[in-house]
Amino acid sequence: MGMPDRESLGGPVACEPPFVAELRRLGVEVAEETYVYGGKLSRTPLRQRVVRVLATARRFSRLLREAEFDILHLNSSFDTMALLRDAATIQLLRPTRARIFVKFHGSDAALFETNRAELRSLVRFVLARVDGIGLLSAEERENFRRAGVEGQKLFVVKNVVSAGADEKSALQVQQSANLLRAKLGVDAEETPLLLFIARFIPAKGLTDVLDACAILRDEGRAFRLLCLGDGAARAAAEAQAARLQLAEQVRFFGYVPEAETGEFYTGSTILVFPTYHYEGFPMVIFKSVAAGLPIITTRIRAAADYLREPDHCLWVEPRNPQMLAEKITQLLDQTEARAAMRRHNLELARQFTARVVAPEYLEIYNQLAKT
């Protein structure tokens, strides 16, 4: 299995290790190889990228020669850089008896409509040479189907989401919130904590969140916004917060390791995540589901497949700070609605445990192995 580097950022590093652990518990022999192209926060030189891809392909080839593996599972993304890596890897591996299954952690549908002939050829090459494609939402499956990909190759799959606050009582959740407030120096117990956690790129919607916070502040609403993450848009976001005079309301934490984010999910009041990125299964949303955290987000891909308003979330339009501010106000003013969201989200989270998700993949693997 091609795995993310354990030091990398994003969803795969959170969901794939517990998935592999469950496969092994079920008796499946799994060999892991790091399968990355470059870094998230810093640019990796082209030469280093090429060397890394070639070395990874050689390791895969050796493993497939030395043992009779049935499936090669690659964790990837349907974007230009990842497809370049995938094409090189697949070409260097052929021929192989193992069936190749690629799980796309997000997909850029614009690649199907590109005018660049070399990109169209790259897309056709990869999609023609894999045996199965894992997509994280029904929308993505429909995009691939409309682009002419054979339906029998397409599978809608889930990410594993580690258990959150399902065994915590309401009192324990309040205690978590109080501990987080104490750590942050927020004295007032009634001050709500809004959470934004993501890689800082414009499409994640942080600009809209900050504009919405300025509206809330001007309306006299007390709150704190906790911004966890790093990336290319961080400097612009910090400058925007300063320009809007939000120093008292907004705190930037920078990158927080996955293992240290739990207290923010369980201690915050609402996740505010108006993303319009092409991610398939936003782990921030589903980690919030697992923590029983009320959610305000956009109706995007896997979120649209599994979440329902008002049971699990409130929907907001992308690039609409006024609407976002109104939804935040609505949810903050409805204590019972937040409590109901917590219950419903904890129930929904059971669908994404490793013990539920791993057997679903085994069915796909068995189907591919028989073809």
Regions found by a protein language model. Give the residues of each.
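Nucleotide-activated donor-binding/catalytic signature segment of Leloir-type glycosyltransferases, i.e.
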Residues: 238-256
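Donor nucleotide-sugar binding/catalytic pocket of nucleotide-sugar-dependent glycosyltransferases
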Residues: 122-179
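Acidic donor-binding loop of glycosyltransferase active sites
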Residues: 266-280, 293
